[in-house]
Structure formats: C-alpha cells, structure tokens
C-alpha cells in the first residue's frame, strides 16, 4: 500500500493536517518535503471519504537568530527581533513576508490548498491565550517533563513564555518574573521593566511548548515533521507528553520524514546558503514533477536531488510512470504515485520528450521554429500552450543547471572539423545510403549503427564522428533526434562540405 494511504487507513472522523515553517530565509526545495507530504496525506484522507482541513503555519514571531550568509551585516541590529518586525531585504514590506509570499505562489502552482496562518495572528487574536495561561499555571509540571526527556536541568524560575520587549524590540532577551492572567511581568537585558498581555502578540512560547499548544488550540490530528524533531528526546517527545499531561489531548499522528539532500553537497539549509529556493526550482521543472519527486519516495528515506543531469533522469522516470498509467499497466503503488503527483488528472503527458526539447532549443532560437520542429517529430497533436510552458522550463534549466556535456552550439559553416581517415570513411558511407533511407530519428540511429558495423568499428566511434562535425565535441544529444531536427538537406550539405574541405 502506498505510504500515505497506509498512514491514514485506520483514521476515523474529521482530520486536520498541519505543517509549518519559520520564514527566516528562502523557503527551499528541502522544505517542500514537509508541505507536500502534508498535502499528500490531506488528499489521502479525502480519498478515504473523510472530511479534512489542511493548514500551513508561518512562525513569523520567531526571532532572527543571527545574520545569515544572504543578509547584509546591517541586519545585526535586528538579531532577536521577531521576523515580522524586521524590514524586508528588498526594502518592501517585512522580512517574514519577503520569504513567505514567493512560497505561497509555489503552493498555488503545485496544487497545495493549505490555509496559511501566521503565528502572530494566533497570538494577536488571542487564539493561544488559553494555552499560554494553562502552561504558565502548570509550569512546574512542564519543567519536570522537559528535564526528564531532554536530560537537561533548567536553572532558576521557569516561565514558558518569552515577552516581546516594548523598548528594544527583542523577544530573546527578556525574562518573566511574575504572572497573573493576562499579564506576564518581565525584565529585559536592555534594562526595561514591563508587562506583556498574553492575549496579544506581545510575546511567544518557546518552541517545545508552543508546538503542543498549537495542536491543542487548532485541534491538529496529523502532522509530518523532520527527523530532528522526531529524534529521541526531541521536540515531538516533549510535545506529546505536554499534549497528554497538560492539555489532556492526544498528540497528532506523526509522520517523520528524512531530508532532501542536494546531491554531492549535503542537506539543504537556507541558514548556510546551501539551498535552492522553491520559487526558483519551479521555473525549471513542472509542478507535477516536483510533486513526483516527493511522492515516489517513502518519507522514511532521504531524497538525493540533482538539479543537473538528475533532473533529466527524473523527467524520464516520470514519463515512464505516465505511460504505464495511461496504458493501465501499472501496480497499485505506482498508480498512487502518479495520482498524487498530478494536479490536473487530464494532464497525463507532456507535449514532447524533455531531452529532445533540450536539443531543439539549442538548434533553434525562435519559439515558432521550436514548435515547428517539435510538431514534425511526433504524430501526436501538440498543445501549443503546454509546449511553450515546457520550452520555458527547458530554457531555464539549460541556463541555470545543465552540465557542460549537455550544452552545445552548432559549428558555423567555416568551422570545419579535422577528420581522420576513419571519420571520412564513416561520413562517406553514410552519404552512400542516405538517399534510400527514411529521414526519421529511429532510421538515422539504425543507419549509423549499420555504417559502423559495415566498417568494423564500434558505434560510439561513429557517433563521435557526427558530433565532431556538427558541434565540435566527442559526445552530444541523441543523434537520431539531433540529425532529424537539423533536417536531411542541412545534414547532407554539411557532411559534403566537411568532406570537400578535407579532401
């Protein structure tokens, strides 16, 4: 059974799935695993016939913890400020929205219907006030839970609330000295003494307490989260104890997921600068392919993401799944993977093979010429709008992530390759049979193989000869498609020119 269907198979009644993030930096491809895992679980619950709601929490009350690599050093004065109270790096609006808003657009494009809720609104509208009052009154019990599970002693008076200093603006430099509903009395390292109203966005709970408080206030029943939270002694271990013993609720059904690794570099973290923003990757791959990247791998396994050649391989794999799905020759898990990947069920194919399109856009410059060549290479009716979208993805990928061995440029007529006797023999033999061959990609491919066989040489050597003549490299795109799209007249004329120039 597919992992999401297995996770929800025993659930009854209405469900609320929650995911979230602290918008401290660019929300990246690695973060997509959480929200897409949540979305797939949400859709699995709906498929079971249960009512469901899906929320995405933006923790904009979290403080800026340091000056990250992508920030100017002038942001040092904002360390400790809530993210919602810091100017945006681009000078427009606030810091948290600067990173959240592009991600909301990614959510829309990838078919994620989650309601976005800002934590500052939960505090500001008093939604968490009851939970705060409860944890403040029962702080000694919470202290015991934290110490037993984490193995770390908490020194001095413990109040599970962090007031926002009304003087210096920091939320990480205050200490509560007394509490009487609804006010937490505090002092700040800046020297200020004041009172914070727990019914307003005048402070926040520490993460280990805030998380179960959200479960309680929002009635969360399912939540995926990363393995760091799910580790022994981690925040889920403390959260479920607080949920049961302090709030009297069952903790959400957990689904722990592994990280997405940037191939050859490690886990993605916006705080280290090792990350690809989700808003950027959605420009180089269709949203369905991003969903497929997540859906096809059980959350318990990490994902190696390679935006270079690996993206082409991922596209190939996706097309294989789609073909089997269309033909009805597919197992249950693979069928589920495709159905949870698709945004529109009618979109069961892409206009043209992505690798082939990468070749076309390097041969032709104008979209109209690419469209004409694409139409000539398939018997299927092409959706022009969908093809133009795919052209956009292909061009962006070629510009940003394509390895050098995929890129090529046609040699000009005066850039003639130096040919060996073997090269000349291969090209001459190809010319001999070219008049009688059908000019399609499969026939061209077979002909080059047969030429190599007739001359007693390996096919790789024959292919290299053609790449040398047309792009000045030893390797290149799939030769049959490549020569087909160059056209028979152009191909034959170029070969004759090169042979004549080296005679």
Curated annotation (Swiss-Prot):
Keywords tagged on the record: Aminoacyl-tRNA synthetase, ATP-binding, Cytoplasm, Ligase, Nucleotide-binding, Protein biosynthesis
Residues spanned by motif 'HIGH' region: 23-31
Annotated Gene3D superfamilies: 1.10.10.350, 1.10.10.770, HUPs, Lysine tRNA ligase, stem contact fold domain
Catalysed reactions listed for this entry: tRNA(Lys) + L-lysine + ATP = L-lysyl-tRNA(Lys) + AMP + diphosphate
GO cellular component: cytoplasm
GO MF term list: ATP binding; lysine-tRNA ligase activity; tRNA binding
Uppermost EC category: ligase
Protein biosynthesis among keywords: yes
One Pfam family recorded for the sequence: Anticodon_2
Subcellular location(s) of the protein: Cytoplasm
Family, per entry: Belongs to the class-I aminoacyl-tRNA synthetase family.
PANTHER family, sorted: LYSINE--TRNA LIGASE
Protein name as annotated: Lysine--tRNA ligase
Source organism: Thermoplasma volcanium (strain ATCC 51530 / DSM 4299 / JCM 9571 / NBRC 15438 / GSS1)
């Amino acid at each position: 059974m597919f992992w999401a269907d297995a996770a929800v198979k025993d659930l009854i009644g209405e469900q609320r799935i929650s995911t979230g993030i602290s918008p401290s930096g660019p929300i990246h491809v690695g973060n997509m695993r959480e929200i897409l895992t949540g979305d797939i679980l949400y859709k699995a619950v709906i498929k079971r016939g249960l009512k469901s709601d899906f929320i995405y929490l933006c923790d904009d009350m979290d403080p800026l913890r340091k000056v990250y690599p992508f920030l100017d050093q002038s942001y040092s004065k904002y360390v400790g400020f809530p993210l919602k109270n810091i100017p945006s790096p681009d000078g427009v609006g606030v810091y948290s929205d600067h990173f959240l808003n592009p991600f909301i657009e990614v959510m829309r494009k990838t078919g994620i219907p989650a309601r976005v809720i800002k934590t500052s609104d939960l505090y500001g509208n008093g939604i968490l006030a009851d939970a705060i009052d409860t944890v403040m009154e029962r702080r000694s019990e919470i202290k015991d839970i934290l110490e037993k599970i984490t193995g770390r002693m908490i020194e001095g008076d413990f109040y599970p609330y962090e007031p926002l200093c009304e003087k210096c603006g920091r939320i990480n430099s205050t200490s509560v000295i007394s509490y009487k509903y609804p006010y937490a009395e505090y002092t700040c390292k800046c020297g200020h003494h004041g009172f914070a109203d727990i019914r307003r966005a005048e402070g926040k709970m520490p993460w280990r307490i805030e998380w179960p408080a959200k479960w309680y206030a929002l009635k969360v029943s399912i939540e995926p989260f990363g393995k760091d939270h799910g580790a022994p002694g981690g925040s889920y271990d403390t959260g479920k104890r607080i949920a049961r013993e302090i709030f009297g609720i069952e903790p959400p059904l957990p689904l722990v997921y592994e990280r997405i690794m940037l191939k050859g570099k490690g886990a993605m973290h916006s705080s280290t600068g090792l990350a690809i923003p989700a808003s950027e990757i959605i420009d180089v791959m269709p949203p369905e392919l991003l969903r497929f990247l997540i859906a096809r791998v059980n959350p318990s396994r990490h994902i190696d993401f390679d935006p270079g050649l690996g993206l082409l391989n991922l596209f190939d794999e996706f097309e294989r799944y789609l073909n089997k799905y269309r033909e009805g020759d597919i197992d249950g898990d693979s069928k589920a993977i495709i159905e949870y990947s698709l945004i529109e069920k009618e979109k069961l194919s892409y206009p043209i093979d992505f690798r082939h399109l990468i070749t076309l856009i390097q041969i032709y410059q104008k979209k109209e010429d690419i469209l004409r060549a694409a139409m000539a290479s398939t018997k299927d009716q092409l959706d022009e709008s969908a093809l133009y979208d795919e052209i956009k993805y292909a061009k962006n990928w070629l510009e940003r992530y394509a390895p050098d061995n995929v890129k090529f440029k046609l040699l000009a007529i005066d850039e003639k390759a130096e040919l060996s006797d073997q090269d000349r023999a291969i090209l001459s033999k190809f010319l001999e049979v070219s008049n009688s061959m059908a000019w399609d990609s499969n026939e061209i491919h077979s002909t080059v193989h047969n030429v190599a066989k007739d001359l007693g040489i390996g096919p790789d050597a024959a292919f290299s000869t053609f790449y040398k003549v047309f792009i000045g490299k030893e390797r290149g795109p799939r030769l049959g498609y490549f020569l087909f799209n160059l056209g028979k007249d152009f191909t034959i004329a170029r070969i004759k020119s090169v042979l004549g120039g080296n005679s």
